[in-house]
Amino acid sequence: MAADAHAALAATRNIGIMAHIDAGKTTTTERILFYTGVNYKIGEVHEGGATMDWMEQEQERGITITSAATTCSWRDHTINIIDTPGHVDFTVEVERSLRVLDGAVAVFDAVAGVEPQSETVWKQADRYDVPRIAFVNKMDRVGAEFHRCVDMMVDRLDATPAVIQLPWGVEADFRGVIDLIRMKGLLWHTEDKGASFETVDIPTDHAEAAQEWREKLVETVAENDDELMELYLEGVEPTEEQLMAALRRATVASKINPVLCGSAFKNKGVQPMLDAVVDFLPSPTDIGSVTGHSVGKEDTEVVRRADEDEPFSALAFKIMSDPYVGKLTYIRVYSGRITSGTAVLNSTKDRKERIGRILQMHANHREDRDGVGAGQIVAVVGLKNTTTGDTLCDPNSPVILESMIFPAPVIDVAIEPKTKADQQKLGTAIQRLTEEDPTFQVRTDEETGQTVIAGMGELHLEVFVDRMRREYGVEANVGKPQVAYRETIRRKVEKVDYTHKKQTGGSGQYARVIIDLEPSGGDGGGYEFENKVTGGRIPREFIPSVDAGCQEAMEFGVLAGYPLVDVKVTLRDGQFHEVDSSELAFKIAGSMAFKDAARKADPVILEPMMSVEVTTPEDHMGDVIGDLNSRRGQIQAMDERGGSRIVKALVPLSEMFGYVGDLRSKTSGRASYSMQFDSYAEVPQNVAKDIIAKARGE
């Protein structure tokens, strides 16, 4: 790779800004764009003017729904920022952006500390091993406690925080930060929106604390970096350069998390945080190579280095419809280089694609690029068959990169177009919106003929319906949200024998199968099929048909017609007829044998359980707990945080509809809650009876 291309790659940072809803992520991103000169005016979230929140729904609700990708530069480095949503209904956005990032900034609220969605996002980042720095925001707010936030990072996230700044003043007196690496104070000026700050000596009343925390910092880094440990053991005080280098090594290795603080809204502390992104977070060259597998051979590993001389490989991580250029596919290039007009292979689907325009995206405007190389994040136009998670690569050297894991939807609503014209538009809208978001699922209810859309929560579906109306002009009636129940079995049944026979004029149909059915112990998505037929009792070409029949039968369970999950089918034996056996006959036999077996295997209904966290004043604690108990909730823990009480509980989703209104009225609007999917659990018998009766129309 040419030296200048390598230098450009080393000076690139692909980062995400992640946090709980309302911790100030989008505001922080807006400040970054302001200080890096991309924006000339600061956009405020509460005024609906933030650059990154460019969908109408986001500007109205003041939350970020889609990850907008923006490029800016700082200290001669290119920073690609992905602003991710903190609302739990949009976890898929976080999941897909973490997959393509090299590093992240976790933003915490200095008042609330580590909140539930912060934990979820942190765990997602752990899964992809994304190095992180932390920014404790809102230091100017009443109740801000920096050290409590750092302690919570240890207790709740199992993180190793390396505090590199202390707050100078707190709440209304928050003036700046104390830099523990350079041992200086940084003071911000308010007249130029915090664009400049001065470096001063540490004031005497902070000197002792600064010295104590500096020692802790060196100790923490030394414990996680061999080179610094040697100096530490020799009793040598590290130089600024040595400490910076050790901090970088330990952060890139995901051993520590440097912690900074500030107030993005008050324009304090953002520039040092940008410095930390450049100084401590990895470039694509630090990440090195990416591993995939050969097409059709999952056990054959293929490695691609982050180098423009390597064959081209990229991952499509987001699809968006743009009113001006049509379908945009956001890609992260891992190796090689492409120019517009290049033919590439979608190796996931084995389809050829042609790259049209290549666009560098700022939050709501774009610039055309002739070509793009390893390490970059861009949007391309012209890909017809590519969806989220697909690999694009050089047709002469195919590879499939690791994709993403998306959670199954937990809630669905029926949707009916108001007119015939809406019916046609609905099809287009659903196709485009499901392309954009893989956690939306659409099916047609066989009995009612209604279109049913499923998603991750009420807000998720609300935004979906809203976008259909605004962007595609679809007027539709939306039903009440329904819970996505599942069915499973509790015991093993053996040798369930089913023969499918049909004799009419001409050739008939004949297939006999004998199966075992048992629980597979998965967590909501499992299915296994094992073939133990010997001696050609069922010809090899009919085995996949039995498997397909079983899978088809799983879609509608035997109790209330909900999908059946977590089962293992073993095909033990069977019979065929020289003339009358066919793929269809064995598919029907497999399906009917499966249903028979499921009825005998003690079937039960499962419901989604939500992890709920309620923050309430002490005097409403009893009402909140009583209400959660009345909703079949199981109280898991109670905590105290900043004068409020925190109640954690597991509650069935079916009991949580309309909870926001009930909680408001019970606590005079003083309590708040967050909820996220936890697991599926068996429904109590009395509740199951009602569900079954309703499903059967009794």
Swiss-Prot record:
The keyword GTP-binding applies. CDD domains: EF-G, EFG_III, EFG_mtEFG1_IV, EFG_mtEFG_C, EFG_mtEFG_II. PROSITE patterns: G_TR_1, G_TR_2. GO terms for biological process: ribosome disassembly. GO terms for molecular function: GTP binding; GTPase activity; translation elongation factor activity. It holds the Pfam family EF-G_D2. InterPro entries: EF-G-like_DII (IPR053905), EFG_II (IPR041095), EFG_III (IPR009022), EFG_III/V (IPR035647), EFG_IV (IPR047872), EFG_V (IPR035649), EFG_V-like (IPR000640), G_TR_CS (IPR031157). Its main location: cytoplasm. It is found in: Cytoplasm. GTP binds at residues 19-26, 83-87, 137-140. Keywords: Cytoplasm, Elongation factor, GTP-binding, Nucleotide-binding, Protein biosynthesis. Residues 10-285 form the tr-type G domain. It comes from the Bacteria. GO terms for cellular component: cytoplasm. Catalyzes the GTP-dependent ribosomal translocation step during translation elongation. During this step, the ribosome changes from the pre-translocational (PRE) to the post-translocational (POST) state as the newly formed A-site-bound peptidyl-tRNA and P-site-bound deacylated tRNA move to the P and E sites, respectively. Catalyzes the coordinated movement of the two tRNA molecules, the mRNA and conformational changes in the ribosome. NCBIfam families: EF-G, PRK12740.1-3, PRK12740.1-5, small_GTP. Belongs to the TRAFAC class translation factor GTPase superfamily. Classic translation factor GTPase family. EF-G/EF-2 subfamily. This is Elongation factor G. The gene is fusA.
